[in-house]
């Protein structure tokens, strides 16, 4: 898990004081990264969109007030939700609240964590959520078959799923599953059916032929997943 941490602080603040705050958070996040397997990448507000795109999540570290423009300019280069860690003093929290409010007004999602007791746990949770978001954005899900009357056209459904949920939706004809199931290796299908029967405490129905048919369908689905490089179907 790679996380870009971007520090923002007002140029009117004492440099040594701001540097001391930054070093404190760097040390604390290093401990968190070591315990959770998170790789933190540190940047200043001049970080490019290309550099940010190499990470899975964005953590904006607000070290003082007077950082609204800097923070918003960073978020504008990022495609995804943002976690904002606000120093507990020097108007940093007020700046963080304004940054998030303005970012939300143009479609960005995010949360604020104040740098007080327990903040590392909150940041860890925020990063876990960001990882889930990133995984969903990379996911490809297969949708098999169609109905005579569709509520939404396939292209519209693909767009809605992508926008709201994140994954790319791929529509596949049901006939492809039927063909792959028929072509499934008989020995492999029998092994899977036997495994399912052995794992069951009791079988009333289906019968052996139905179990074998289910195993063939499973092998057909697995072939579709492999050929189309799907994460789910």
Q: Which residues make up each language-model segment?
A:
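An N-terminal assembly and electron-transfer interface module characteristic of large anaerobic redox
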Residues: 1-232
């Amino acid at each position: 898990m790679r996380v870009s941490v971007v520090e923002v602080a007002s140029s009117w603040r004492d440099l040594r004081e701001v540097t001391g705050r930054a070093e404190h958070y760097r040390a604390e996040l290093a401990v968190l990264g070591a315990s959770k397997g998170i790789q933190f990448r540190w940047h200043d507000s001049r970080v490019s969109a290309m550099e940010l795109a190499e990470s899975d999540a964005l953590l904006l570290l607000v070290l003082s007030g007077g950082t609204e423009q800097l923070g918003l300019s960073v978020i504008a280069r990022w495609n995804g939700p943002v976690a904002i860690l606000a120093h507990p003093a020097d108007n940093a929290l007020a700046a963080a609240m304004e940054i998030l409010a303005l970012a939300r007004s143009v479609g960005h999602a995010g949360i604020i964590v104040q740098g007080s007791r327990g903040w590392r746990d909150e940041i860890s949770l925020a990063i876990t959520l960001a990882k889930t978001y990133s995984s969903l954005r990379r996911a490809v899900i297969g949708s098999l078959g169609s109905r005579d009357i569709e509520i939404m056209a396939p292209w519209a459904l693909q767009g809605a799923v992508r926008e709201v949920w994140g994954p790319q939706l791929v529509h596949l004809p049901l006939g492809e599953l039927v063909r792959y199931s028929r072509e499934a290796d008989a020995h492999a299908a029998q092994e899977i059916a036997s495994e399912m029967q052995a794992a069951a405490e009791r079988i009333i129905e289906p019968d052996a032929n139905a179990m074998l048919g289910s195993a063939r369908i499973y092998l057909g689905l697995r072939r579709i997943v492999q050929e189309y490089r799907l994460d789910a179907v």
